[in-house]
Amino acid sequence: VARSCYMNCPKGAVHFDKKTGQARIDHDTCISCGICHKSCPYHAIVYIPVPCEEACPVKAISKDEHNIEHIDESKCIYCGKCLNACPFGAIFEISQVFDVLEDIRAGKQVIAIPAPSILGQFDASIEEVYGALKQIGFADVIEVAEGAMQTTSNEAHELLEKIAEGQKFMTTSCCPSYIELVNKHIPAMKPYVSTTGSPMYYASRIAKKKYPDAKVVFIGPCIAKRKEAQRDECVDYVMTFEEISSVIKGMRIDLKEVSPYKVAKESVCEAHGFAQAGGVAGGGE
């Protein structure tokens, strides 16, 4: 009788029970390579997927010799899919909520720069959401959409220049996860990525120019922005929509009862459309 699992195991982790003849896997020896699963013609060995490994689009997560999962930083693109997929909460992001609230409580000038997609996050008008941010203690609110207008203008000029040079297309530089993907996994795409800064990049500089000594807090939906902020000296903290929503609830702020706040400079609708599919390209047109 063929024993494919036994013959193909590189670590000799498969053995047979002398009484029953059933195959057993020694998990102290097994390295979870999957060779036995692939070689068994009877499908007697079942692969149990690990949610975080399955969710990772770049295969950056794997187990070590002790069966412990690790994230390979040289492959990770900080998309957050593993965080959402893990049913045990074993993967978590490092929050800066308490740092932000501590600075506000200490009387420091803290400026909020919310992403355009905040428009669809709350069941309230944008002025009411900004009013809630003011009630939390933010000294001012500057829309990232204002920075998006600069991104749109600069990317449009850059695209025209590259087309004139013979380049057929150009991709956006707005998404930090995409930038990590290109740098780590598709280096051949690097020449086609725009060198224009993201909306957060420009908005943070607008905030720092207006409030040189202030702490600038980017508020958005994406945890990859935390990585981008680490490389940007003008962004001090990053909060997700989930975190800002928790603060609003924790402080018992009713969005329908706050004093609406209107930003000093309103952004064009195209700048708010960056969050939609095709929004960046549409703005450039």
What are these regions (language model features)?
Residues 2-27, 35-77, 81-96:
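Iron-sulfur cluster-binding cysteine motifs and their immediate structural context
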Residues 87, 92-285:
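Iron-sulfur-associated redox domains of electron-transfer enzymes in respiratory
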